[in-house]
């Protein structure tokens, strides 16, 4: 029988933390915040239940850490995607392609992201704690749209904030759809329609 780990040595502390975050995200996504237990997470991570507290003092802290980890993964990928393109519409297209790639690599990723809002609504302490994490979505989209506006790539009459809200709604809607629709070809077809719609609504020629 493999002995589960207790207090970690410095050398494997980061690996253990990664395992805890992985198992916690799986549990939060499939079982929900209320039904997730340290015992379940520790069993999957190969450590004792008590060892989790060396990394995360509470379940709230653990959930926030998972959210921060997921946000970093998503927006680091978005940042890398848009830097490979020059125009706003090319970058917009790349966001959908990246979301599809992330979904292929990690099918449960979108489920956790979508579920965060619901969990925060039901748990005031969680909602308060999540505010400690800098929201990268608004910063990312604001910079993307402000840059496009300054280069004349958005309709002159379209405020930057409106463009940000449109992108947030479209990307959020696509994320929610990807949770219920597991057919990747269907999702790619929807992404293609969104891309075409953006050319009609967000290009200067549409003004």
Place the predicted regions along the sequence by residue.
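N-terminal intrinsically disordered/low-complexity leader segments
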Residues: 1-15, 22, 180, 206-207
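Amphipathic alpha-helical segments used for helix-helix packing
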Residues: 91, 104-128
């Amino acid at each position: 029988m493999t002995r589960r780990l207790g207090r970690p040595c410095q050398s494997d502390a980061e690996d253990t933390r990664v395992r805890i975050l992985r198992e916690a995200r799986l549990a939060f996504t499939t079982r929900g915040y209320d039904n997730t237990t340290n015992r379940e997470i520790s069993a999957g991570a190969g450590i004792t239940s008590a060892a989790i507290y060396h990394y995360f003092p509470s379940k709230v802290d653990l959930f926030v850490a998972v959210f921060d980890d997921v946000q970093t993964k998503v927006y680091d990928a978005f940042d890398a995607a848009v830097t490979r393109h020059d125009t706003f519409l090319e970058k917009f297209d790349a966001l959908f392609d990246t979301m599809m790639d992330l979904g292929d690599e990690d099918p449960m990723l979108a489920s956790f992201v979508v579920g965060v809002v619901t969990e925060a609504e039901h748990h005031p302490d969680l909602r308060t704690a999540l505010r400690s994490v800098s929201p990268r979505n608004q910063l990312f989209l604001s910079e993307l749209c402000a840059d496009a506006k300054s280069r004349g790539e958005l309709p002159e009459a379209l405020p930057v904030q409106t463009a940000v809200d449109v992108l947030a709604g479209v990307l959020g809607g696509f994320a929610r759809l990807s949770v219920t629709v597991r057919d990747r070809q269907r999702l790619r077809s929807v992404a293609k329609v969104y891309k075409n719609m953006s050319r009609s609504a967000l290009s200067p020629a549409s003004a």
